[in-house]
């Protein structure tokens, strides 16, 4: 936290910020769009939630923030900040070289793949809400672009058995797929 929020280390609110940011799991996302930093800053609203409620009442911080520290989301304030922050969270292409390690527990869990068509339809959040409503804990989640050979190997047991095998492979190849670990007692059986 001290490294990520280095510009705030000497400020009076830093201890509260550090305590809050390390109190539970944090989800990191890289959002991609033309002028993404500026667009995201507009969506999230002012840092101070009282100001956000007054000046940007439909913003994320006005809707979900409770105070200046617990203001729901973080957003880079410049392209330079974005580059530094993305490097901090996501590192490079090699998962082993990433500064943040997985939160996967690999116990009482099952794998869920949110397929590309769900993402294209903008329903990823609804699927995640349904998983949580069913009593599962989501202990790890990551977005992957899977190649055809990887998808074919993953679904190999269904080749020649599942009539929709080839369309499934086509749909899942070279598209973003959200993989998540869902945890619950007897997760494999209860997830189905």
Segments and roles (model prediction):
Residues 1-192:
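Non-catalytic terminal and connector segments of soluble metabolic enzymes
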């Amino acid at each position: 936290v001290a490294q990520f929020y280095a510009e705030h280390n000497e400020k009076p609110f830093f201890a509260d910020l550090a305590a809050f940011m390390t109190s539970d799991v944090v989800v990191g996302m890289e959002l991609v769009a033309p002028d993404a930093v500026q667009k995201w800053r507009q969506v999230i609203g002012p840092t101070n939630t009282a100001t956000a409620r007054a000046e940007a009442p439909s913003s994320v911080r006005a809707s979900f923030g409770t105070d200046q520290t617990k203001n729901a989301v973080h957003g880079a304030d410049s392209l330079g900040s974005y580059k530094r922050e993305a490097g901090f969270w996501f590192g490079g292409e090699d998962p082993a070289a990433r500064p943040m390690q997985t939160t996967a527990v690999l116990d009482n869990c099952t794998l869920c793949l949110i397929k590309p068509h769900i993402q294209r339809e903008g329903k990823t959040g609804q699927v995640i809400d349904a998983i949580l409503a069913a009593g599962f804990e989501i202990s790890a989640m990551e977005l992957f672009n899977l190649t055809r050979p990887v998808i074919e190997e993953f679904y190999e047991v269904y080749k020649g058995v599942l009539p929709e095998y080839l369309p499934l492979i086509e749909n899942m190849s070279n598209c973003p797929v959200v993989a998540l670990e869902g945890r619950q007692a007897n997760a494999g059986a209860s997830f189905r």
